[in-house]
Amino acid sequence: MEHQQNHTFSADTGKLLKLMIHSLYSNKEIFLRELVSNAADAADKLRFKALSDGSLFENDGDLRVRLSFDADLKTITISDNGIGMSRDEVIEHLGTIAKSGTSDFFEQLSGDQVKDSQLIGQFGVGFYSSFIVADKVTVNTRKAGEPASQGTCWISTGESDYTVADIEKAGRGTEITLHLRDDETEFLNDYKLRGIVSKYSDHISIPVEMFKEATEESEGSDGEKVPATEATWEAVNKATALWSCSKSELKDEEYKEFYKHIANDFEDPLTWSHNKVEGEQAYTSLLYIPKRAPYDLWNREKAHGLKLYVQRVFVMDDAEQFMPTYLRFVKGVLDSNDLPLNVSREILQDTRVTAKLRSGCTKRVLDLLTKLAKKDDDAYNLFWKEFGQVLKEGPAEDSSNKEKIGKLFRFSSTETDSTEQTVSLDAYISRMTEGQDKIYYITADSFNAAKNSPHLEVLREKGIEVLLLSDRIDEWLLSHLPEYDGKTFTSVTQGDLDLGKLDSEEKKKEQEKQETEFASFVERVKAVLGDKVKDVRLTHRLTSTPSCIVADNDDMSTQMAKLMAQMGQPVPESKPVFELNPEHVMIVKLADMADEDLFAQWSELLLEQAILSEKGSLDDPSEFVGRINKLLLA
């Protein structure tokens, strides 16, 4: 070996190695699945690059993975004749975990072995799983198209460092040799290895081969002669593209294992959809909904999308053009007959075929989720907990599917008064009271703030259901989804609450009478508060609270203004409308108060209380405290 160098693992890589060996030990056979999966990917990449440069095959176009073991040396070797790696690529891919969000990943680890193993699976440990069973790993590799002298050897014990050196390697591709720990000799068994390959890698589209010894001619149980066979490498797996098989040929277990292969996930998927489409565009899609959200779901820079194949030839990972951003959690494969084999990401950006494929895949996912929501509440609620907030991005991005997406939404409401978001818009509409033509909602910082808001008092009294919205995205969502099924979304904290037909004629007459009786009182309060408020008026939305503030119809809602301020965005200046409950004893007493100074202090205090209740804070808390103290002594 020449040009030998020692390198230290990056801190994150060393940390992950120790953690992974501890957390994944109970499922240690997955090391073979990971290494075979990587080898198959290397073959896919070579096949694609060879489309434009046939010399990369080096007169050896039969791509395969080979698996062997040596019981005396206690080694297992996985080799492929795929794309291979250069020295720089070896250092980049094997010396560090070149992934964004690694530190976020570590922050999410809980110390719970089951949960952590699931998270590590989401992260995609790949090659590093070798160290679960091996105390030393040797990698010999040469990149396709490079001379034999340009091979690279990588050696590590999986502790703090690794060695890289130049070697001579006749064949292209990668050979990984695992030097097993003394207590891992169970894997030095032909039957055991064949069983693991069949279990995890049957769906790999290239053959995974193991050596079969020659046999002599013998006599069978029925007396017939069994002919001799020559020693040969034989395929252990089916080696067919799983998505190209008909659904009737496939078992659920095969679908699940294929998902784990393409998604780098240790858990089964929640559900999937396998479809073959013929006609103007011919394509096959196999789309999966994961059971858990990845730790980096909100990292918009992270690549996402489907594995793209053209006529079963791998083209690219993370082809995001075929799935809208609000469905970025979907994993799967798209195999098109209509795209050119030399397709690039740039070509995909703006083609009629791409638009048709994207529309088709989007429809499949929305139909799949609709079906799941109808047949399995528990499974759909699990999906909603993990991905609901991402799905709420849908109406803004995909206006053509607004109603379909809206049907999938789940919220908390006054019907359940639970933090669990289980109420669909269809269920809400089915419970609407006679004469109700609006979907009422409230947005707040938290579920409890929404649930206990005074703005709900009259609606609760009348038995009118209100959606309780406390996700940060909710206010923005409703700006893009103003109505559903012909019913307008109406905020109970914005504008004058017009209950229309829900109020009796008798109640309306009583309200008109109160407007007249309290007119001079309202003017006195306006005079005291001046430009602190946009308007003062009587309210009919309160029953047990003396006052509240609301945003005017044309102004930004309090919650939206708060969110924009938190994000450092400029917020348009607006003042609240101050509403007073004429049936509350405090308001009745205030209306009769002759002392103008006391009247002013109580009016200010009621406004500050209403602001505190709605916004959660005051511009000048000390003034508020001073006012309370003054009134306590009055």
Curated annotation (Swiss-Prot):
CDD domains: HATPase_Hsp90-like (cd16927). GO terms for molecular function: ATP binding; ATP hydrolysis activity; ATP-dependent protein folding chaperone; unfolded protein binding. Disulfide bonds: none annotated. The keyword Cytoplasm applies. One of its GO terms (cellular component) is cytoplasm. InterPro entries: HATPase_C_sf, Heat_shock_protein_90_CS, HSP90_C, Hsp90_fam, Hsp90_N, Ribosomal_Su5_D2-typ_SF. Residues 563-634 are annotated as: C. Residues 346-562 are annotated as: B. Homodimer. HAMAP family: HSP90 (MF_00505). Molecular chaperone. Has ATPase activity. This is Chaperone protein HtpG. It comes from Psychromonas ingrahamii (strain DSM 17664 / CCUG 51855 / 37). The lineage of its organism: Bacteria, Pseudomonadati, Pseudomonadota, Gammaproteobacteria, Alteromonadales.
